[in-house]
Regions:
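N-terminal membrane topogenic signal
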Residues: 1-11
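Membrane-helix boundary connector in multi-pass membrane proteins
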Residues: 59-60, 66, 70, 76-96, ...
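Core segments of alpha-helical transmembrane spans in multipass integral membrane proteins
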Residues: 10-21, 33-56, 69-77
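Alpha-helical transmembrane segments and their membrane-interface exit regions
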Residues: 42-47, 98-110
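Non-cytosolic membrane-interface motifs at loop->transmembrane helix junctions
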Residues: 29-38, 89-99
Length: 114
């Protein structure tokens, strides 16, 4: 299970990096849309890193555990909203349900502890 926990965390980081770099090909000029696209990628990277640190150090302090739970709930909420918005085009956007599933997995790992 520990391996799967680490894998899910680093997959979130990887998807966040891909999302951030894709922004450069989708948006050719600075815009509000580009900023939101970029910030979503940064959010995924941060959530993945929080989970990677938590997975590496165990349950940790109460504040750190709360931070991981909050980050995972935020990933799940954004994933749900994105799946609702892209419901007709999920086959072209497989990263949307992937991020949601990874958020749920990491939340379960966080709540389970060691």
């Amino acid at each position: 299970m520990k391996f799967l926990d680490h894998l899910c965390a680093w997959l979130l980081v990887a998807l966040g990096c891909i999302h951030t770099f894709v922004m450069l090909t989708v948006y050719h000029h600075a815009s509000a849309g580009a900023l939101w696209f970029f910030s979503a990628g940064m959010f995924q990277i941060l959530a993945g890193l929080v989970n990677a640190v938590r997975a590496n150090s165990g349950r940790g302090t109460a504040l750190f555990r709360f931070t991981a739970i909050f980050a995972n709930c935020a990933v799940i909420a954004v994933g749900l909203m994105a799946m609702y918005l892209y419901i007709g085009a999920l086959w072209r956007n497989p990263q949307v349900p992937a991020v949601f599933v990874l958020g749920v997995a990491e939340l379960l790992f966080t709540l389970r502890g060691r």
